[in-house]
């Protein structure tokens, strides 16, 4: 019986992992589809090149990428009706939450996002209620903790804003929203190993929650929003929670 129980747990775990992987692939495909509206050639479409690189890093099969490009560029089928939608709201203790989604049905997505907020002590707000608490920035991740002097020299040339040594051993470079292509291409051309790049919503200031129960509720809200099929990204101003 114990063996059967263990096997059942393995199957359940695999189903959860497969489900999350499938949802991720769906979101990545949608990002490619939207980017491909501006042209099917990634060499001349930076947004598409970014989406493809992100998808390949996550293991999205080449066939899925090709179909997403064809759908977005209108090759052989009806053009995609996906649109980018931003939602803003509050979590426990007034934590600011900014959600970006790609959807072909605004009503469905809004209902799902609203339900996730209400189930986890939050509230969906009006457009603009928390976006002023974030900066929309570019970020480029480099391999390893880079040598400071040559990196600083290159970042000054490229007009980057800052860099941060990450806990995973990489180096994250930040810049203005419009600087993404310049930073990515410039760092690559100067010999740095670029792992990935994209845009992010960076909180102007972080909010600390001392109560571990409330902090956990905030995390569950973020996880619930991230699990929605239409959601691409979830940003909050919650300070990192130190594990005991």
UniProtKB/Swiss-Prot annotation:
In which organism is this protein found?
Synechococcus sp. (strain CC9311)
Which compartments does it reside in? Cytoplasm
Task: State any GO CC term.
Answer: cytosol
The record's annotation in NCBIfam families points to:
PRK00110.1, PRK12378.1, YebC/PmpR family DNA-binding transcriptional regulator
What is this protein called in UniProt?
Answer: Probable transcriptional regulatory protein sync_2234
Q: What is its main location?
A: cytoplasm
Q: Which family does it belong to?
A: Belongs to the TACO1 family.
Query: InterPro entries, alphabetically?
Result: Integrase-like_N, TACO1_YebC-like_2nd/3rd_dom, TACO1_YebC_N, Transcrip_reg_TACO1-like, Transcrip_reg_TACO1-like_dom3, YebC-like
Gene Ontology terms, MF aspect: DNA binding
Q: Which residues form a coiled coil?
A: none
């Amino acid at each position: 019986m114990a063996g059967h129980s263990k096997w059942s747990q393995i199957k359940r775990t695999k189903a959860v992992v497969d489900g999350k992987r499938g949802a991720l692939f769906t979101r990545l495909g949608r990002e490619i589809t939207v980017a491909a509206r501006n042209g099917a050639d990634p060499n001349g479409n930076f947004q598409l090149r970014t989406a493809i690189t992100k998808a390949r890093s996550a293991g999205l099969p080449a066939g899925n990428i090709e179909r997403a490009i064809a759908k977005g560029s209108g090759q052989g089928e009806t053009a995609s009706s996906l649109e980018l939608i931003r939602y803003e709201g509050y979590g426990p203790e007034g934590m600011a939450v900014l959600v970006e989604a790609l959807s072909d049905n605004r009503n469905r997505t809004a209902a799902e996002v609203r339900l996730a907020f209400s189930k986890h002590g939050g509230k969906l707000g009006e457009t603009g209620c928390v976006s002023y608490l974030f900066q929309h920035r570019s970020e480029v991740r480099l391999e390893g903790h880079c040598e400071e002097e040559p990196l600083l020299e290159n970042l000054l040339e490229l007009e980057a804003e800052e860099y941060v040594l990450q806990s995973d051993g990489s180096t994250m470079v930040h810049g203005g929203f419009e600087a993404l292509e310049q930073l990515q291409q410039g760092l690559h051309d100067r010999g740095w190993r670029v792992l990935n790049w994209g845009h992010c919503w960076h909180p102007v200031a972080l909010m600390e929650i001392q109560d571990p129960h409330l902090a956990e509720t905030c995390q569950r809200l973020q996880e619930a929003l991230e699990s929605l099929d239409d959601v691409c990204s979830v940003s909050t101003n919650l300070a990192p929670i130190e594990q005991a």
